[in-house]
């Protein structure tokens, strides 16, 4: 089930697909 959540890792992104699992790319430029 862990892969269904957004891991609390600070990752830079330009789009949702840059992020892990259920993370989405926030306006701040980081996954969340």
From Swiss-Prot:
One GO cellular component term of this record is: extracellular region
- State the source organism's domain of life: Eukaryota
User: Residues at site: Reactive bond?
Assistant: 8-9
Q: Which GO terms describe its molecular function?
A: serine-type endopeptidase inhibitor activity
* Protein's cellular compartments: Secreted
Disulfide bond positions: 6-23, 13-25, 19-31
Question: Is the keyword Disulfide bond in the record?
Answer: yes
Q: Cross-referenced Gene3D superfamilies, in alphabetical order?
A: 4.10.75.20
List keywords of the entry alphabetically: Disulfide bond, Knottin, Protease inhibitor, Secreted, Serine protease inhibitor
The family database entries (SMART domains) matched by this protein are listed as: PTI (SM00286)
SUPFAM superfamilies under this entry? Plant inhibitors of proteinases and amylases
Q: What does this protein do?
A: Inhibits trypsin.
Domain comment (free text): The presence of a 'disulfide through disulfide knot' structurally defines this protein as a knottin.
UniProt family annotation: Belongs to the protease inhibitor I7 (squash-type serine protease inhibitor) family.
What this protein is called in its record is Trypsin inhibitor 2b
Organism encoding this protein: Sechium edule (Chayote)
Q: What is the lineage of its organism?
A: Eukaryota, Viridiplantae, Streptophyta, Embryophyta, Tracheophyta
């Amino acid at each position: 089930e862990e892969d269904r959540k957004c891991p609390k890792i600070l990752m830079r992104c330009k789009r949702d697909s840059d992020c892990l699992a259920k993370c989405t790319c926030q306006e701040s430029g980081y996954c969340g």
